């Protein structure tokens, strides 16, 4: 404790020096030779002491005045130290519902610079508010059972704000037609990866985003992680590690040696199909073996050569098994439409933070066969945006990128997502994880699920009945203190009545109350703020609602028409073959 604070704390007690000083002066001036005589004539002493309003500076009077003030200060200190600690009205808990005053510091005055959470609560997009204590990350956990309105009450209002770039999972393929016209009106670049109808999708080539050898390893890791069979063990065995070496070698060869037109998954599949190993002839060389032999002669320390050399350490029978495993893993790519989808790239993932862009990822909510493509894309997207922010923009993207991950459990596993969600905030990237129940997250990310939830400062519960989710929400809401009134009656030879009052702790909302919560209500929790029980956001009251297909069917967005129009526009980076024709007359 500093001296200034100590002085201010004891200053009031200096005022008591005066009465104790005057008391000592009155006793000293009272007539009488002994104690009894002075006490009998103490009135005369007070009269003499009051004759002068000033403090008596007689050493005895001054000493007694100071001593009296010190004794009083010590008495107050000892009483406070030994006092019982009461928390009146909050003995069993202080939980309560939040008010407008609680959320006010976290909202921006400009409505469109917020993320709508409920009808009355929203959070600002400003990552660095004037008062740092009000800073919260924009990672949001949205939980709602089937039919609770996750798309209508959260996704659509977020997109209609149009303050960021958006990457939005669209499980049913309905969000883009309903919101696309509005985004086009706002001059957004619109991208679409459609894994239900490939013909309505823009092209996506994962190899187009490889910038270094570490990107090759990241791509291979994401590919293997999201193409596991349902019965496959989570820990890698020998075969998976061998596959990893082979994929790394082939992709490394393509990236370094192939032409720009050949840097795609089609070339990778062609190389795998051209690979062969014979059990009875260890010296046999397939066309792929010959390619790597030629490369090794030129560059013995080539990245691809090192990976391939390790792969070829296996015997012929083992190599054949590995190649079969590779073919089985990439079997979905035998579909021509999927191969065409990944022939070249139109998504331009690394530019999402440069200007306002909306990327819709349309997934099937009934079949997860091609969901690994989305997981590959998201894995690359996080790394690309973080690298772009660090290398070109001093650590922060000029346009905030919001990932609205509807049906997050259907996307697949994004490698190191628990680490990414903890670091993307500073790069102006945020993720909204939308689930039907919290157990879905634990199924995919196991122990890392708690880390992911812990890095979401906001939680929006739209309703549900899954038991573990209800238990967790109820515990987070906390307990309030309530008054209990008991009335008793005893009947015997005489009738007696009794009354008793006591306090108890009760959950702000119990699990059964959460399970039967009004369908129009939701619970919003923000770190460091009391929870809010509010109405779900009314989409029809949004200022931009009139531009959606919900308001007017004429606003339905046609992605095929949009893609044709975009492909007809010549870009500065497009290359052409120029032929000179000499016309003779």
What are the roles of these predicted feature ranges?
Residues 105-106, 372, 408, 464:
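A short glycine-/small-residue-rich loop at the edge of a beta-strand within enzyme catalytic domains
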Residues 19-21, 25, 136-429, 444, ...:
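P-loop NTPase motor domains
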Residues 421-523:
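Conserved ATP-driven motor cores of ASCE-family P-loop NTPases powering translocation/secretion/packaging/pilus
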Residues 111-117, 372-380, 473:
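Conserved long hydrophobic alpha-helices within structured protein cores
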Residues 1-148, 152-155, 479, 490-491, ...:
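Basic- and hydrophobic-enriched, low-structure N-terminal and domain-boundary segments
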Residues 123-125, 129, 228-238, 260, ...:
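Low-complexity, polar-biased intrinsically disordered regions enriched in Pro/Ser/Thr/Gly
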């Amino acid at each position: 404790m500093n001296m200034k604070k100590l002085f201010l704390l004891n200053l009031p007690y200096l005022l008591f020096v005066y009465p104790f000083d005057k008391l000592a002066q009155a006793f000293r001036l009272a007539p009488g030779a002994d104690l009894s005589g002075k006490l009998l004539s103490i009135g005369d002493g007070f009269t003499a002491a009051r004759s002068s309003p000033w403090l008596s500076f007689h050493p005895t009077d001054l000493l007694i005045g100071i001593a009296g003030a010190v004794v009083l200060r010590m008495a107050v200190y000892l009483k406070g130290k030994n006092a019982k600690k009461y928390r009146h009205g909050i003995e069993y808990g202080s939980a309560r519902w939040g008010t407008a005053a609680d959320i006010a510091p976290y909202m921006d005055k400009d409505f469109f610079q917020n993320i709508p959470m409920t009808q009355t609560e929203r959070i600002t997009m400003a990552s660095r508010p004037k008062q740092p204590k009000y800073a919260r990350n924009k990672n949001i956990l949205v939980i709602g059972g089937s039919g609770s309105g996750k798309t209508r009450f959260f996704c659509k209002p977020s997109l209609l704000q149009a303050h960021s770039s958006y990457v939005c999972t669209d499980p049913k393929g309905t969000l883009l037609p309903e919101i696309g016209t509005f985004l086009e009106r706002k001059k957004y670049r619109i991208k679409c990866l459609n894994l239900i109808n490939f013909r309505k999708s823009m092209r996506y080539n994962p190899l187009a985003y490889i910038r270094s050898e570490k990107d090759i390893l990241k791509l291979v890791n994401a590919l293997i992680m999201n193409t596991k069979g349902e019965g496959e063990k989570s820990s890698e065995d020998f075969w998976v590690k061998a596959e990893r070496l082979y994929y790394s070698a082939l992709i490394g060869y393509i990236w370094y040696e192939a032409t720009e037109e050949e840097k795609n998954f089609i070339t990778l599949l062609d190389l795998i199909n051209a690979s062969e190993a014979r059990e009875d002839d260890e010296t046999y060389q397939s066309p792929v073996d010959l390619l790597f032999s030629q490369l090794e002669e030129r560059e013995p320390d080539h990245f691809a050569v090192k990976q391939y050399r390790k792969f070829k350490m296996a015997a012929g029978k083992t190599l054949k098994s590995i190649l079969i495993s590779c073919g089985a893993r990439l079997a979905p790519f035998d579909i021509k439409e999927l191969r065409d989808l990944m022939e070249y790239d139109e998504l331009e993932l690394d530019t999402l933070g440069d200007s306002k862009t909306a990327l819709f990822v349309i997934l099937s909510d009934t079949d997860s066969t091609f969901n690994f493509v989305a997981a590959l894309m998201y894995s690359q997207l996080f790394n690309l945006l973080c690298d772009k922010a660090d290398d070109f923009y001093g650590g922060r993207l000029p346009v905030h990128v919001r990932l609205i991950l509807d049906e997050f459990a259907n996307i697949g596993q994004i490698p190191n997502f628990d680490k990414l969600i903890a670091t993307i905030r500073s790069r102006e990237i945020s993720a909204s994880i939308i689930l039907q129940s919290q157990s879905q997250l634990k199924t995919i990310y196991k122990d890392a699920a708690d880390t992911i939830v812990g890095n979401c400062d906001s939680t929006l519960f739209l309703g549900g009945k899954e038991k573990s989710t209800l238990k967790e929400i109820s515990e987070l809401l906390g307990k309030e203190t309530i008054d209990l009134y008991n009335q008793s009656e005893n009947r015997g030879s005489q009738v007696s009545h009794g009354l008793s009052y006591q306090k108890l702790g009760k959950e702000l909302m119990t699990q059964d109350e959460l399970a039967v919560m009004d369908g129009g209500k939701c619970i919003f929790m923000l770190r460091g703020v009391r929870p809010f029980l509010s109405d779900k956001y009314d989409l029809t009251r949004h200022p931009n609602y009139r531009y959606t297909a919900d308001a007017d069917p004429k606003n339905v967005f046609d992605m095929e028409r949009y893609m044709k129009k975009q492909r007809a526009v010549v870009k500065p980076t497009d290359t052409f073959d120029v032929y000179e024709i000499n016309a003779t007359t």
